[in-house]
Amino acid sequence: MDPDTVARLLHLNRRFYQTFGDEFSQTRQRLQPGVRRILEALDPQARLLDLGCGNGQLAVYLVEKGFYGEYIGVDSSAALLNEARKKIPNSANAALIQADLAAPDWDQALSGRQFDVVLAFAVLHHLPGESLRRRLLEKARALLDRQGRFIHSQWQFLNSPRLRARLQPWQKAGIQEADVDPGDYLLDWRRGGHGLRYVHHFTGAELQALATATGFHILETFYSDGETGDLGLYQVWKAT
């Protein structure tokens, strides 16, 4: 994907979250079953980095379940981080950092840190182009302890007829279909107004190739979420 298209897709998603951040957060007041499954298996004293932490619901859930390790959340949205600060108990060993995960220096504030677990739920599918995804994964790998785990989820929206009906032609965003990659889609948003956002639909083969290219191997894969239990693809990776 050429740099201009990458920049336009990133701008599209930034504008979406700036415009519909409050409405989006209202739809994310409960964690998905797959996320809860992952969190319930975590060591309660782990050093945890949560990429794309959003409104802090994950951190609140951890505290309620007795987590007493270190939690650091990273997100680009000031509005969502402000909401997270209001939610997370002051007693929690938690810190929040505003940084754009698409930027080359998003990890600057974490220099020299090591984590037992890096989480990236619903993050990679909003990053356009393989090179941008690889860069994030390489940085995540560098932040992991030697025995650490990278755990992520990918939205499998094509498994839902309702969501498939929300797909929009690229022309609505002023982008040509020939300029995007296979698996790239434009979805609409209808809560509190009409918006558009970019999402990539990952296949298992794509994720395997990404893991291999960035020095990981896949330990576990499972599907969860939605009425049919297959709207989220979850994986646990370990550095090779």
Q: Which residues are covered by each model-predicted region?
A:
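SAM-dependent methyltransferase
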Residues: 151-210, 220
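A short glycine-rich, Lys/Arg-flanked "PGG" loop and its adjoining helix->strand segment in the class I
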Residues: 134-146
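Core SAM-dependent methyltransferase catalytic element
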Residues: 224-240
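Conserved S-adenosyl-L-methionine
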Residues: 216-226
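Class I SAM-dependent methyltransferase SAM/SAH-binding core
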Residues: 55-106
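A conserved beta-strand element that flanks and buttresses the S-adenosyl-L-methionine
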Residues: 119
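Conserved class I S-adenosyl-L-methionine
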Residues: 1-43, 45-52, 57, 61
